[in-house]
Design a protein with these regions (language model features):
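Glycan-recognition surfaces
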Residues: 1-125
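Solvent-exposed beta-hairpin/edge-strand motifs
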Residues: 197-216
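C-terminal beta-strand-rich structural cap/linker in extracellular carbohydrate-active enzymes
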Residues: 221-246
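Hydrophobic, well-ordered secondary-structure elements that form the walls
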Residues: 180, 211, 234
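Catalytic cores of secreted or luminal carbohydrate-active enzymes
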Residues: 108-160
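Carbohydrate-binding surface patches
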Residues: 107, 113-116, 121-123, 161-203
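Generic recognition of flexible, low-complexity loop/linker segments
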Residues: 100-102, 165-170, 226-227
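Short, glycine-/Ser/Thr-/acidic-enriched flexible segments
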Residues: 120, 127, 150, 185-187, ...
Length: 246
């Protein structure tokens, strides 16, 4: 007989540091998610700095996915669109409810949960999925990052000129590749850059990165010293990069 042990802690102090000793296979470290961008952003940012504590056999569950709900959940907490009506579970403060997200925001949500090693539990009604929702939830390239056998936590590299809203998450993979998520939480499109020395690959190493785009499903080429791209507001780029000699 097999069983899965899940502990619901909801942001108890230092849960990351002691939860593995409990024997739990999954643990909740956040309040409940809601189907709006501000909730997704808040939960994701709450994980920055604690990425290293999850791992094989003890996974950090950032709550289910709201991808594809589009304001259509039958749960009042998740779906309310009234400004200031609901209360955020983990802080007690009110915030506006936006009645669902754009497909771009759902794509970012899925990418964040994947690279942060959270379980990818579908929350929408799969009988009513749009083609865009199905495309997001069945992206094999992004799912492969989440399911990497070594389950290493990512580390965060903040954009120097906008550290509160623009950052990259870099996750080493079992075969030596890097999974790279570049996220723009701001309200304007912006140019993002990843300097390779920040991941231990200076120009003097004679190595660069061969980069594959996990959402466009295409090879982008080989880059040295840095990778630069434009990321839409509330959007992301998810890359799989292989170290190559240049």
């Amino acid at each position: 007989m097999e069983f899965l042990m899940i502990l619901l802690i909801h942001q108890q102090d230092n849960v990351y540091k002691w939860i593995r000793e409990s024997g739990a296979h999954l643990f909740r470290s956040t309040g409940d998610i809601q189907d709006n961008w501000e909730s997704i952003k808040r939960l994701a940012l709450s994980q920055i700095g604690s990425e290293c504590y999850g791992g094989n056999f003890c996974h950090n569950d950032i709550d289910m996915l709201v991808v594809g709900m589009h304001g259509g959940s039958n749960n009042e907490w998740i779906n309310s669109t009234e400004q200031g009506v609901n209360v955020i579970a983990d802080s007690g403060e009110t915030m506006p409810k936006l009645g669902g997200c754009t497909d771009e925001e759902y794509r970012t949500h899925f990418s964040l949960w994947a690279i942060m090693n959270s379980p990818l539990m579908i929350g929408c009604d799969i009988r009513r999925m749009t083609p865009a929702t199905k495309e997001i939830l069945t992206n094999k390239d992004v799912i492969a990052i989440n399911q990497d056998i070594e389950c290493r936590g990512p580390y965060c590299i903040k954009q120097w000129n906008n550290p509160d809203n623009v950052f990259s998450l870099v996750k080493p993979l079992a075969n030596g590749d890097y999974a790279i998520g570049m996220f723009n939480f701001g309200d304007r499109a912006g140019e993002m850059s990843l300097q390779f020395w920040d991941i231990g690959l200076p120009a003097a190493s004679g190595r660069g990165l061969s980069v594959y785009d996990c959402w466009k499903h295409e090879e982008l080429g080989t880059f040295t010293e840095r990778f630069v791209t434009t990321v839409e507001p509330h959007g992301c780029a998810v890359l799989r990069a292989k170290v190559v000699k240049v």
